[in-house]
Curated annotation (Swiss-Prot):
GO annotations of cellular component type: extracellular region; host cell postsynaptic membrane
Keyword Transferase among UniProt keywords: no
Pfam family, one: Toxin_20
Name of this protein: U4-theraphotoxin-Hhn1o
Entry's family note: Belongs to the neurotoxin 12 (Hwtx-2) family. 02 (Hwtx-2) subfamily.
Entry keyword set: Disulfide bond, Neurotoxin, Postsynaptic neurotoxin, Secreted, Signal, Toxin
Propeptide feature ranges: 23-48
PROSITE patterns according to UniProt: HWTX_2
């Protein structure tokens, strides 16, 4: 029961993060159509922060702690947030 609740909450959080990222990409594409300078687009990238999610395997081996999911694709984890590098 507890694992199911955690899985549902994790999926909901991932869905919200992906929706937010899609909206930002759409906004960036509209900004590029208007002819926004690259320096302003870089500022938009710097403001993008996503919470680092904690990934736990359902079947743990012994008493090992859950490990934080690593940020990928030009992002690094800092203060429990994924920050654009």
């Amino acid at each position: 029961m507890k694992v199911t609740l955690i899985a549902i909450l994790t999926c909901a959080a991932v869905l919200v993060l992906h929706t937010t990222a899609a909206e930002e990409l759409e906004a960036e594409s509209q900004l590029m159509e208007v002819g926004m300078p690259d320096t302003e687009l870089a500022a938009v990238d710097e403001e993008r922060h996503f919470e680092c999610s904690v990934s736990c395997e359902i079947e743990k081996e012994g008493n090992k702690d859950c490990k934080k999911k690593k940020c990928k694709g030009g992002w690094k984890c800092k203060f429990n947030m994924c920050v654009k590098v």
